[in-house]
Amino acid sequence: MKNSHWNATEPDIKTIKSSFDNPINALAQTETPAFIIRHAYNPNHCAELIERFKHFGFMKDAHRSEADKRPRIDIGTSLGNLGSNPEKFFKHAKSTHLLFKFLFDGFDNPLHCIYQNLSELCPGKNVRTARENDGSKYGPAIIRIHYDGQRYKPHIDHVVLRESRTKFSVHRFKHQFAGVLCLQNADASGPGAQSRLHQCLWTPKIQPYIETETFSDYAKENRIKNCQVKLSPGDLYFFNTQLIHEVPAIVGNQPRVVMAVFIGSSPEDDEIAVWA
């Protein structure tokens, strides 16, 4: 489907699959900036899961928040944070798998929500958590809690182009994507801006503008289109992480909470690998 205005494709899997024969390939070719699946997860369970995270002590204590200066808290294992020490990374990932076995008890499993919807976008592919040849599994997803002031400047996410993690099996994939499930917005009054996706794939030519934080000027001068993704709790979206993208700063006392994954795919590979 031609997308001359470069808008996200939404609001459900049926619309996405009727628009593209091979949705994941359409994302790879940036025919659309994102797939948004509204109400993919039960919004009522989102609020109750947040309460569970608080009860387990995963979030800042409201009575001590001024003393706790952390801009972000992660529940889960991040290759970006721990990949420099593979032994520590896989040990930590094993603990995450154990935690996620009971963390969502009594609720619809948000992890299953992401994986099942991803499978719908990848016809003929086997979606599973990434692993090494020896069977060591990566973390299946990560829950990120973003507090006041936390933002992400224009950047890309890529195990090779950005992080050069060529010792890990996921470096073999030609394309990398992300899936983000909104559990709570910073602004509880309505839809919140989760990201701005620019119609610009990373190249070495673009890197100087990222390093000098002048990409916004470059985008204006070159009339690069962008798509702003706004989600409500329970909404899920997928996008190509080689697109230059940014996330606005959190404002206020209520954190933004998401469950996120990275996704690896190659046309000739039957596997779709998922990790965090």
Where does each model-flagged region fall?
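Catalytic micro-motifs at enzyme active sites that drive phosphoryl/nucleotidyl and oxygen chemistry
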Residues: 23-24, 127-132, 248
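Short, flexible loop/turn elements at secondary-structure junctions
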Residues: 39-41, 142-147, 158, 181-183, ...
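Extracellular structured ligand-interaction cores
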Residues: 32-34, 138-140, 174-180, 192, ...
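Signature of the catalytic double-stranded beta-helix
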Residues: 85-148, 164-165, 171
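Catalytic core of non-heme Fe(II) oxygenases with the double-stranded beta-helix
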Residues: 148-227
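Catalytic core of Fe(II)/2-oxoglutarate
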Residues: 207-276
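Generic detector of solvent-exposed, compositionally biased contiguous segments
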Residues: 1-26, 144-157, 223-244
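N-terminal auxiliary "cap/dimerization" subdomain that precedes the catalytic jelly-roll/cupin core
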Residues: 1-101, 105, 109
